[in-house]
C-alpha cells in the first residue's frame, strides 16, 4: 500500500480532476471566465470581448449549449455575462431560465460580443474575457486547466496575477504518477478512501438514461438499442456498453441540460472512463469494491496520461479515456498488473493518431470506436496476447509507450491541429 501522504495527494488530484460539468467543458469554461469578469465589473456588461487559444476555439465551435437549442460560443458568452455564476464552476449556467435565454439571444442580436483568436501564446488552453460597461472594464483570464483563473483586474487595477514571466502561465502542477503507482493506488487503497468515485457512475449512468428519453445528436446510443443493431451486435455486454456510453455523449454534445462527471476537464472523457466500466461490472456481477477500484483505476489512468499530453491537444481525448476504461475492464475480468500493461499497449497500438476536430455530436462515434477497442484490448490481454516492442511505437516499458503516445499527440500532431482548425474555420469560404 502507498504511504498515507501519497494517497492523500492522489485523492486530492482525483477530486480536482473529476468534477461535475453541464455541457461541453470548453464553451462552459469560456462562459465561466466571462461570468467572473462580469462579477468583477459589478454591473451588466454592455460589451464582451473574448480572446481564445486555437484549441478552445476549435472545441467550442460546433457543440450544443445546454438548455438553449443553440450551438457555439456566442450564446455561451452571452449567458455567462448575464446569468452565469462563477461559484458553480463548469455548471456556470445551470440556473438558466427561459427569460435568461431570451435575454441572451437579445444580447447576441445587439452585437455586443466580439470573439477573436489570441495571438502570441503557447498555451493550448487560454481564455481571456474583457467586460465593459460605461467607463469601466474588467478582465479575467483562465489558463492551463478549465477552471484555473490566473489573472483578474478591474479598471486596470490587478486583483490577482498568477502568470509567469512575460505573461506566460506557470505549468500546472500535479502528483508525479506512473502506471505502477496508479495500479497500486487503485488496488490497495482502503476502499472507504476512494468510494467517492461512485459519484461518477451516478452522474454518468443517469446521463445515459436521460439521453435515451430524447433525440440528441446522432442518437447513436438509442440506435444501438434498436432491432437492426441488436440483430447485428446482439443483446450483449458489448452492445450495452456502447449504448450506455454513446447515449451520454449524444446528450452532452446535443446540448441537453444534464450534468456529467468530467475527467481532466472533459465531460466526454469522464463518460468514457466511467460508463464502460460501470456497465461491465453490472453485467459481470462484480462486487461493489471491485467496481470502486476499477473506476478509480480507469479515471486515474486517464489523469496520468493527460499529465503529459496536456488538457487540450490534437489527439482525441476519447483515446486517453478509453485506455483508462480498458484498464478498468481488464481488472474486472480478473486481470493483474501485467494484464493491464498489455491492455494499455494494445490500445496505444490501435488508436494513436485519432484527431480531435472539435467537440460536436459526432464525438459519440469516436467514443464508440475508443470503447469498442477498450473491450477488445482487455479481452486480448486476458488471453495472453499483446502488441510487442517489435511493433511500431510500442516499447517494452509501458510508461514509455504512454509517453510515445502523448509525444505524438502533443508535438508531432501540431501541424495537424493547425490544419484541422484551418479547415473548420474556412468551410464556408
Q: What do the PLM-derived regions correspond to, one by one?
A:
Residues 2, 6-40, 45:
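N-terminal signal-anchor module of multipass membrane proteins
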Residues 2, 21-25, 55-56, 147, ...:
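A structural signal for small-residue-enriched, beta-sheet-centric alpha/beta enzyme cores
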Residues 31-121, 126-128:
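Early transmembrane hairpin of solute transport permeases
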Residues 37-38, 280-293, 303-369, 382-392:
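Hydrophobic alpha-helical bundle architecture
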Residues 1-11, 43-56, 236-255, 288-305, ...:
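Acidic-glycine-rich active-site phosphate/pyrophosphate-binding loop
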Residues 20-36, 258-275, 316-320:
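Conserved phosphate/anionic-ligand binding catalytic regions in large, soluble enzymes, centered on
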Amino acid at each position: 500500500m502507498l504511504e498515507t501522504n501519497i494517497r492523500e495527494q492522489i485523492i486530492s488530484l482525483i477530486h480536482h480532476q473529476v468534477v461535475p460539468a453541464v455541457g461541453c467543458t470548453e464553451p462552459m469554461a469560456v462562459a465561466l471566465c466571462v461570468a467572473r469578469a462580469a462579477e468583477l465589473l459589478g454591473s451588466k456588461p454592455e460589451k464582451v470581448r473574448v480572446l481564445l487559444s486555437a484549441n478552445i476555439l476549435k472545441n467550442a465551435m460546433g457543440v450544443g449549449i445546454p438548455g438553449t437549442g443553440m450551438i457555439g460560443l456566442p450564446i455561451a458568452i452571452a449567458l455567462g455575462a448575464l446569468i452565469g455564476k462563477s461559484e458553480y464552476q463548469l455548471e456556470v449556467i445551470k440556473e438558466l431560465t427561459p427569460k435568461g435565454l431570451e435575454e441572451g439571444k437579445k444580447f447576441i442580436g445587439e452585437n455586443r460580443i466580439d470573439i477573436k483568436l489570441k495571438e502570441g501564446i503557447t498555451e493550448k488552453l487560454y481564455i481571456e474575457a474583457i467586460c465593459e460597461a460605461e467607463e469601466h472594464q474588467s478582465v479575467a483570464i483562465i489558463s492551463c486547466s478549465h477552471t484555473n483563473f490566473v489573472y483578474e483586474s478591474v479598471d486596470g487595477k490587478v486583483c490577482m496575477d498568477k502568470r509567469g514571466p512575460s505573461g506566460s502561465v506557470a505549468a500546472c502542477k500535479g502528483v508525479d504518477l506512473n502506471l505502477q503507482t496508479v495500479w497500486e493506488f487503485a488496488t490497495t487503497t482502503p476502499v472507504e478512501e476512494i468510494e467517492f468515485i461512485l459519484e461518477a457512475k451516478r452522474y454518468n449512468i443517469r446521463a445515459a438514461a436521460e439521453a435515451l428519453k430524447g433525440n440528441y445528436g446522432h442518437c447513436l446510443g438509442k440506435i444501438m438499442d434498436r432491432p437492426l443493431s441488436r440483430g447485428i451486435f446482439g443483446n450483449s455486454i458489448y452492445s450495452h456498453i456502447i449504448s450506455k456510453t454513446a447515449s451520454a455523449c449524444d446528450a452532452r454534445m446535443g446540448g441537453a441540460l444534464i450534468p456529467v462527471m468530467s475527467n481532466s476537464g472533459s465531460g466526454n472523457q469522464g463518460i468514457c472512463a466511467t460508463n464502460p466500466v460501470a456497465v461491465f461490472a453490472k453485467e459481470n456481477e462484480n462486487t461493489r469494491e471491485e467496481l470502486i477500484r476499477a473506476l478509480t483505476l480507469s479515471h486515474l489512468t486517464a489523469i496520468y496520461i493527460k499529465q503529459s499530453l496536456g488538457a487540450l491537444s490534437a489527439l482525441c481525448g476519447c483515446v486517453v479515456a478509453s485506455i483508462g476504461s480498458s484498464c478498468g475492464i481488464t481488472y474486472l475480468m480478473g486481470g493483474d498488473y501485467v494484464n493491464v500493461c498489455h491492455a494499455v499497449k494494445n490500445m496505444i497500438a490501435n488508436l494513436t493518431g485519432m484527431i480531435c476536430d472539435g467537440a460536436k455530436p459526432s464525438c459519440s462515434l469516436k467514443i464508440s470506436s475508443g470503447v469498442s477497442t477498450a473491450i477488445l484490448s482487455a479481452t486480448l490481454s486476458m488471453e495472453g496476447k499483446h502488441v510487442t516492442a517489435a511493433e511500431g511505437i510500442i516499447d517494452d516499458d509501458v510508461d514509455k509507450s504512454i509517453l510515445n503516445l502523448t509525444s505524438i499527440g502533443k508535438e508531432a500532431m501540431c501541424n495537424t491541429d493547425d490544419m484541422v482548425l484551418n479547415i473548420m474555420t474556412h468551410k464556408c469560404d
